[in-house]
Structures are given as structure tokens and as C-alpha cells.
Amino acid sequence: MFRVAIPRSALNLHSCLLHVTLSLVLISKAAITTAGNEDSDVREARSVSDQQVVHPVDCVISDWSAWSRCDTCQKKRYRYAKLDQPSQFGGEPCHFHDMEDEACDVPDRYTCDSIPLCEGFLCTQTGRCIHRTLQCNGEDDCGDMSDEVGCKKVPKPCRQEAEEYWGIENLAKGINILNSNLEGLVLDNRYYAGSCLPQYIQDVRFRKPHNLQQYTLETKGSYDFNVQSFESYSDYMDYSMRERMTQTIVSIGFAIPGIAEFGFNYNNAKVTRSIQKIRRASSKINSFVSAKAELELAQYMLRSDDLMLHPEFLQRLRSLPQAYVYGEYRQIYRDYGTHYITEAALGGEYEHTIILDKEKLAKTDYSLEDYKSCTQAGLKIGANIYGVYVSAGIEGGSCNGLLNEMGEDTAIGSSVEDFVAVVRGGSSESITGLVSKKLPTPQLMRLWGEGVRFNPDFIRKTTRPLYELVTSKDFSHDATLKRNLKRALSEYLAESSSCRCAPCHNNGVAVLRGTRCDCVCPTGYTGRGCEITQRKKQIATDGSWSCWGAWSSCSGRKMSRSRQCNNPVPSDGGLACRGLQQESTDCF
């Protein structure tokens, strides 16, 4: 492990303000590049085998559900349709509207009581209940300014001016755990409840929003290099997935379909490109050296209770029918994501993976451990590579020659087959420099470390499901609403999971985009099902989960379900499925 510290003097006030600017933070924009010897083993494009033929699958939509009963509060009834079969391999797509409502009459004997009794001031438009002392205080505590109407004298809310946390509103957005996209605002992080409680960061006064328990900025940044070597693709992928799963803690109540691909945004071309390169290396003849650096700059934590919801999100939840109608509840998850962020660490992350050809490596005097040691030396800030020694007999035992090989374009006969560089956080200049090098220089790493302060990103986060934001403070029928939202989340994740797609050939990844399944093919493989290749090497196939089976009947207030690792079955040394095969949860 090697560490480089960024001096406190470098963290001036402007950089602090900028690096907490989360306008660029929370939409993870990972820069990724790869390069390698694409011409090796190239021949005329062909199908890998005569058996690998793909047949178009047409999209199929279910019939309309029955109309729901007339909702007392909304005076509407609803119906919906679901995706029965996504299209794949060039099949006919679906063009449809999957939810409808129409006006209906409610008998006079029924009354609407969706808003709980307010013992303070009930805001006119948003329906928010605030303390009466917040009226006429010069701030929009209601979210519609109704608490400031008719005020004769409006005092200043705080005696001293205070800065607002830059980008704090972005942390209030929901997040879709299937693709890591940030969606609509679910929390109001510009609500202060009249408090002027200050927080000082390097002598600058910040005003703490009501929803926040903690927002801490580091006054000194540092990053560590962790260098690992892996004998095989399966070893590397197993380690990578375990690392990724520890970066996002998800409370959900039941497992996530397709957890092996959890959190990847396959709509991001740069993310897709890195996956294509790594999965191409699933043959048995590849080894890996991975170096990872992390720079943590800030921590964010919500309070545990009494959260103030964003007015629009509050109104959307209150407009849901009291009876369970999947189509209406599904739309909440489409618009606002599935979860909200309760804790986050902000900063930067850099991962550099070198893909080695084991057959060529065996013909040299180098070992996998030599590559690991020299990579570690080459990434050490200020390191003297001439002082690091490897296998005896290698040009005096110095890392110099090996690092030169890793730093130049891949040459014929080189053991370095390819590399993948992933950068999160940092300036455009530093990212461009890092992803264009096979082995980054210490100068580029320092430049990236400085850039992270101005443009940090998520490096770890903890999330909880949206339905946990439903409390009796804001909703009359909170128990029913929460139960319906939990049930809808299970249905939504099942309907939107890529497990519904047929397997792609040659270790391609099947991805459900809307109503269409696409195959993300390893580099060197093409076709709608990755069935065409210009390569002769056989690659492994990683296993993937089937969709979850139906929930069992409720017994002892519990129900269970299971799934199989057969979509596809792992073969030729491919990775086994990770995650639960069986699970149980409370009845809902």
C-alpha cells in the first residue's frame, strides 16, 4: 500500500466550495478507456459454431387489467398492462401506453381523508404541515409561500448570512438501484425548519438543512494504492463483484434480480465498453493485475427520522389510489427511482487493470508476481523503479524494462494483451490523461488528485427503499400506502430485470432496455446475440440467474421464493452466480 497526502494548504476555500459542488457529483460519469492488440487471432468473421443461431423474439404486452374500483379521493378508476415478453434479437418492438385512468362517481357516503390532522399550519397547495412559529419568518417553509401570505412584517430568517451547501439538492434525489441513475427529488434539502444552526468549514459559515445529520468535508485528502494479481478471469471477477457490492449497501427487504449485474448503467457507452473488454478476457489463458486508488473528500448522512419530503413527491404519493393498482405505483418508481440515499462518501476512484496473456507470459522470464510488484512500484508517487527488483536475470533485476513494456503500445509478442482504466471524479484534463496511458505517471496521478477536489463523485453509498419515507406524519393511511409500495417494488424489479432476456452467446451480457433486450458483446464478437466472431480463442461463459419464481403462500407471516443459476449456466471456467438462491420476507 502506498499513500500520497494532499497538503492542507492546497485545500483553499474556493476548492472546498467547489468540491462539495454536487451538481457534477451525483450523476456518476465514469471515464473508461481500453486499448489492446485487436489484430491478434483475427480472421474472416464467422459464426462461432453452426449451432449458434439467433431467432428474433417479438415483444408481447399483457391484456389490460380489470378496472379498479373508484378511488374515493381522486375520483378516478385505473387499469394497466405489463410487459409479458421483451423483444430480442431483432424481434418486433412494442409501442404502447401501459396505464389508463378515467373519471368516476363516488357515492356521497364516502369521504376522503388522505391528509392527516395538522396541529400547526396546513400549507395551502403542498399540504405540508409546519409549526405555526414558521409563519411570517421570511422563508418559504411550505414550498408554496402560503406561510408568508398576509404578513405585515417579515424579519430576516437569520442574523448572519450563511452559505448553502453547494449541490445539496442533488443528494435529495431518488436513485434506481437497477442502473444507478438519479431520478426525481424525494427530499427537500432546502427546508431549514427555521433553524440557523451554523456549521463552520475553514471559517466559512454554512447553514445546515433540517434533513441533514452530518455533512463533513475533509481538510486533507489522501489516496491509497491497492494492487492485486489474479491467476484467472473467474478470480478477478469474483473479487471485483465483491468489491462493488460493498460500495453500495442496499436495504430492500428482498433480493435484487440479477444481482451479479447490480448497479451497472449499461446505457452509458463508456461503462459498456469496459465490460466488453473484461468479458472478452474470460478465456482460460488470461491473468490480471489490478491497481485501485481511492480519494475520499466528504461524508453525507441523513437524519434518521422526521425527514421533510419534497412537495411534489409528497403530492404524488398522496394522489396514489388507496387500493393497490400496480400501474400507478409502478410509475412512482419510474419517476423517482427505487431508493433514496441515506449516507454517502464523496471523492474519486481510479482503477487500472492490466490483462496478461498467460501463454506468452510463460515464455518470458517474468512472473505474474513480477507484474504486480512493478505495477505497484510504477504507481508509487516519487518511486525509484531502479531500486525495485524482480526475477533474477532480468536485465539486472530492475522493473525498468517491464514498466516500459506496460507503458508503451502493446507490441507483437508482448505479454500485456490489453488494459482497462476506469476513472470516477476529477477534472477533464486529468481524466483524459489517465485513460490514455497504459500505466499512468505519478504526475498524472497528482493532477487527478487535485481535480477530484473540484469534481468529486460517489465512491460509497447506503440506500433505503422509497417506501420507508412513508410515515404517519404525512399520510393518513401510512401502513396501507407503505404495504402497497413494497408490493409494487417487488413487481417493478421483476418486470424491469434483465433476467427476462434470453442468454447471449459467447459471454455477452443481456440487458433489458425498456421493452427490448440487447446483447452487450465482448470485444471481437458481434451479431444480435454475439454469435459472430473474428477470434479463434474459446472464452468462458459466466452464469446468470433466472428470474425469481413466484412467492409462496403466506405462512407464519412469511413467504419465500427461489431462482436458478441457468440463464445461462456457467461453463468453460466461467463465473458462478453470486447472491441468494432462496430468500424469504414478511408477507405483504
From Swiss-Prot:
SMART domains registered for this protein in UniProt: LDLa, MACPF, TSP1
PROSITE patterns: EGF_1, EGF_2, LDLRA_1, LDLRA_2, MACPF_1, MACPF_2, TSP1
Domain MACPF intervals: 154-500
Pfam families (alphabetical): EGF_C8A_B_C6, Ldl_recept_a, MACPF
Keyword Aminoacyl-tRNA synthetase appears in the UniProt entry: no
Coiled coil feature spans: none
Function of the molecule: Component of the membrane attack complex (MAC), a multiprotein complex activated by the complement cascade, which inserts into a target cell membrane and forms a pore, leading to target cell membrane rupture and cell lysis. The MAC is initiated by proteolytic cleavage of C5 into complement C5b in response to the classical, alternative, lectin and GZMK complement pathways. The complement pathways consist in a cascade of proteins that leads to phagocytosis and breakdown of pathogens and signaling that strengthens the adaptive immune system.
Record-given protein name: Complement component C8 beta chain
Organism: Paralichthys olivaceus (Bastard halibut)
